[in-house]
UniProtKB/Swiss-Prot annotation:
Protein name: 3-isopropylmalate dehydratase large subunit
Annotated [4Fe-4S] cluster binding sites: 341, 401, 404
Root EC class: lyase
InterPro entries: 3-IsopropMal_deHydase_lsu, Acnase/IPM_dHydase_lsu_aba_1/3, Acoase/IPM_deHydtase_lsu_aba, Aconitase_4Fe-4S_BS, Aconitase_4Fe-4S_dom, IPM_dehydratase_rel_enz, IPMI_cat
PROSITE patterns named in the record: ACONITASE_2
Catalytic reaction annotation: (2R,3S)-3-isopropylmalate = (2S)-2-isopropylmalate
Gene3D superfamilies: Aconitase, domain 3
């Protein structure tokens, strides 16, 4: 019987199927951060239960960590409590913990792949919706709730209903200035934020195959924003080259055995998906959002739609201060944020730096450039990107989720416009009253140096 990549990994991890109910699925890796794990550990204590497979669990703070002065105590009491509680829980239960200032620390969805903890064929969960990021490595990865975190801690298994399968094929070549982020925003603009609800998505096609590992991670990161349970890309030589030599990757003979197995992790030629969607890469241009959900996006040279008369559409535009039919080109912006688990990797910093090289940041723009991890930070400095950025008027902050969400010091003031490389533009996501425009690192860089929304292709 022909199987999809998802089927192969899912079926290999089934412990038992509950009759007319969910599947008991074995989990290879559980990642925990400080926000969704405290109640799970409290539940274990209340029941007197130990962690079943402590060697399969990795903990690190990221949401609440400040992006400056990390060597000092966190000032916000709530943030400090959450970060300290995670450290205590990890110690008490004997779990790996990458705390602040630990050079292994960073955003959990950046650290997992770069440390070789996330590997093809794995099942991976975390109490975070953007766990789908790890699917780029050829894994079945998805976000779970706190009660489910407790379930995995206690048993290394989870009860899940099997999602349907979808394949999104993107063929052709991306044009100048078009990135994986633009691919994702384009898909969402066509499919809406509910277009993949109930499905696990496999991305395929020549445009996907030609993406770097970082690009694939960005693509899978945004799967949840289409309503998908998760997203994945079949592993190939790009994947293997990325993993080889990383800290937790297999070594020697084990590496050869692993790669041999990983090469079998692909959908069979005659595998049948529940739904198939196709896009042409040539139709995609640099994208930007204009509303208050990630599906409200358009090509940067396009105009805000005029045919949507719904109350929710009007409410969204009122919040953003925009009008139907308006072009965003030349619109003054106030903040630029480069970072998040969507675009906080080395390739994103290279792209941003390539555009601002030899230019200067607009005086009125506040720019937060936040590496996704200390490893990314080190590579930025090894490649001399920090010097180029400093000459252009930018500074590198310390790793963390930062302005992706208003849960730490990096908040956008009310009414201000932020061109952000993160993944969500909901009302108040970056701060009460903040107006978020999601975009790629290149679009963010163009806005940072011109002070207005600019087509990056004009500056490349």
């Amino acid at each position: 019987m022909a199987n999809t990549l998802f089927d192969k990994i899912w079926d290999a991890h089934v412990v038992q199927k509950v009759e007319e109910g969910p599947t008991q699925l074995y989990i290879d890796r559980l990642y925990c951060h400080e926000v969704t794990s405290p109640q799970a550990f409290a539940g274990l204590r209340a029941r007197g239960v130990k962690v079943f497979r402590p060697d399969h669990v990795y903990c690190m703070p990221d949401h609440n960590t400040p992006t400056h002065d990390q060597d000092k105590p966190i000032e916000d009491p709530v943030s400090k409590t959450q970060v300290d509680t995670l450290a205590k829980n990890a110690k008490d239960f004997g779990l790996a913990h990458f705390g602040m200032m630990d050079k292994r620390n960073g955003i959990i969805h950046v650290v997992g792949p770069e440390r070789g903890l996330t590997l093809p064929g794995m099942t991976i969960v975390c109490g975070d919706s953007h766990t789908s990021t790890h699917g780029a490595m050829g894994a079945v990865a998805f976000g779970i709730g706190t009660s489910e975190v407790e379930m995995v801690l206690a048993s290394q298994c989870i009860l899940q209903s099997r999602p349907k399968t979808m394949r999104i094929t993107i063929d052709g070549e991306l044009g100048k200035g078009v990135t994986a982020k633009d691919m994702a925003l384009y898909m969402m603009s066509k499919m809406t934020t509910s277009g993949a609800t109930g499905f696990f998505v496999e991305y395929a096609g020549s445009a996907v195959r030609n993406l770097s590992m970082e690009g694939r991670l960005t693509l899978c990161n945004l799967s949840i924003e289409m309503g998908a349970r998760g997203g994945m890309v079949a592993p190939d030589e790009v994947t293997f080259e990325y993993i080889k030599g990383r800290e937790h990757a297999p070594k020697g003979v084990d590496w050869d055995k692993a790669v041999s197995h990983w090469k079998t992790l692909k959908s069979d030629d005659d595998a049948v998906f529940d739904k198939e969607i196709r896009f042409d890469a040539a139709d995609i241009q640099p994208m930007i959002t204009y509303g208050t959900n990630p599906g409200m996006g358009m090509g940067i040279t396009e105009h805000i739609p005029v045919d949507d008369k719904s109350a929710s559409f009007k409410k969204s535009l009122d919040y953003m201060g925009f009008q139907p039919g308006e072009s965003l080109l030349g619109k003054k912006i106030d903040y630029v944020f480069l970072g998040a688990c969507t675009n906080g990797r080395i390739e994103d910093f290279r792209a941003f730096t390539s555009l601002v090289r030899g230019k200067k940041k607009a005086d009125h723009v506040t720019a937060w450039l936040v590496p996704g991890s200390w490893m990314v930070d080190a590579q930025i400095r090894e490649e001399g990107l920090d010097k180029i950025l400093e000459e252009a008027g930018f500074a590198i902050r310390q790793p963390g989720c930062s302005a992706c969400l208003a849960m730490n010091d990096d908040k956008i003031p009310a009414g201000k416009y932020s061109v952000s490389t993160s993944n969500r533009n909901f009302e108040g996501r970056q701060g009460p009253g903040a107006r978020t425009l999601l975009a790629s690192p290149l679009v963010a860089a163009a806005a940072a140096v011109t002070g207005v929304i600019t087509d990056p292709r004009e500056l490349i």
